[in-house]
């Protein structure tokens, strides 16, 4: 693994194209709508800002956005886009990297919390966010629900994407809550492979992490359109809130 983590220049150069469906306005707009509402005129902090899929349209809606990003290559792609140079980006691990000021809302989308591959790092992330939030501020995470029940009995690998030129497999290690995503893509007639490790966490575990950081669960939905979260939900959008200042009489 290089300084840019698993998202080096080779990956960054094709990221937007490979995740094109995630840039569709039908996917992006509900995310931005909710974040604008939660920002309430304040600032937003994106952890794992990437190439700006959410940050750019959020900034276009008038919300001042700052980001943290481990990959310099991904951040360079953001800065090269219209409006990207107006968004401040701190390069570093979002579990520990700090930025100036406080924020009304901080957010992690598209399973990015799983990029932190230990429970210690995930707890540190919650605490880092809490330190950056204003009193009454919110932390939003979008992440998939672990799909262990969809694994065939005795199996540890499940396909998550299959097309003519790209396919992907998730490999689970239940004992460690580890998940490695194996991506295969045909490029110029050759098969390229990228394997990225993750750590999955159940919603209840994330709630406990928030509690350790002094935040409480405010909302949990099955998606950005505020669908109910049920036993059949494949992902959740959760909002934890930092306590507002207590006035002294």
Regions found by a protein language model. Name each.
Residues 140-211:
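SAM-dependent methyltransferase
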Residues 203-249:
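C-terminal lobe and adjacent flexible extensions of AdoMet/dcAdoMet transferase-like proteins
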Residues 1-39, 41-50:
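Conserved class I S-adenosyl-L-methionine
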Residues 97-105:
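A short acidic, Gly/Pro-enriched loop at the edge of an enzyme's catalytic core
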Residues 51-96:
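Class I SAM-dependent methyltransferase SAM/SAH-binding core
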Residues 123-135:
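A short glycine-rich, Lys/Arg-flanked "PGG" loop and its adjoining helix->strand segment in the class I
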Residues 104-120:
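A short SAM/SAH-binding and catalytic strip from SAM-dependent methyltransferases
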